[in-house]
């Protein structure tokens, strides 16, 4: 029994060492990939978005046709992603219009991009409501909604904030963050845009990321 144990201990030690080396290699590879990505896009970046591997992730939602879609279905080309709600009286329409204009400017640069609108008001924003909204703003726009849990999941993944105001009717407002996100299929989240960025600036910055990807 003791002899068998004596043979197992070295084998266990070798296995533990191999596992440790593998974990080190994985972590080191991630660090290298992040560094390469940071250097690759250094000339394009206007925000403090490095470390973007912590932003974004997998999700499952409904599109404007009521179909179940995932992040892999949505992010097939450069994507300009925005979180808002269709009943928003002022900020959302302006931001969504600007993002749609940026997509048009990118098209003039021979760059295809997709504008995506994620609702943070799933109770009112059904697929039918979302469909009318996105058709009004841009023919390529994808609208996403879902259950409360699904919306909460993607909001948490992208570090967004939203909170519906207390109301006794359906005319309530929703407080929410207003960042726009740039997603590249090969890299995920790479940059964000604040409200003070113009459509021209968003298009130029996006084009820089695409050229360097």
Task: Give the label of every model feature segment.
Residues 69-95, 99:
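Short active-site neighborhood of thiol/selenol oxidoreductases, capturing the structured segment around
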Residues 54-56, 78, 175-177:
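Short, small/polar residue-rich loop motifs at catalytic or cofactor-binding pockets
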Residues 80-81, 115, 180:
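Hydrophobic beta-strand anchors of alpha/beta hydrolase catalytic cores
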Residues 1-58, 212-213:
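N-terminal targeting signals for export/organelle localization
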Residues 94-154:
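Structural microenvironment flanking redox-active thiols in thiol-disulfide oxidoreductases
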Residues 65-67, 188:
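Residue-level signal for well-ordered, solvent-exposed loop/turn and beta-edge residues enriched
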Residues 63-64, 184:
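Short, acidic, Ser/Thr-enriched surface-loop or helix-capping motifs
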Residues 150-205:
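Thiol/disulfide oxidoreductase modules built on the thioredoxin-like
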